[in-house]
């Protein structure tokens, strides 16, 4: 776990210098599911996981390919592998935007999926935000809007909805 991570407990503490002192060319450190290259001489890599498992493992996932030439590591390459990409997506309602919630949500989902390849599917946890009055009006019919958003996203090929949460917009800092 090197110096640790905000998302994980320190479970195998060590430092890059400790690993470098061992004389190996490559260290593949496991358990942490996000890919990180910590050093290149020697290579110290947390290769990540080839597929996110839930919305708390967002973004593209990959495997690390090691290219060897003349018995030495010549290069590392990140190879995308995930067919499902989890993301948290915000659909912001405003009194100025007359579009219905499903259209606002679809725009947000399409923006989140814009960088995905044709073989990848977005699975989104949608947070509906906005002013309190607008949210309250939609929250009264939350079950309808959840179903409508999921149907609209599926019809448009914009991915799958894992969950829809209605929450107020963040309050301005005091």
Describe these PLM feature segments.
Residues 1-95:
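Functional cores that coordinate and move charged inorganic groups
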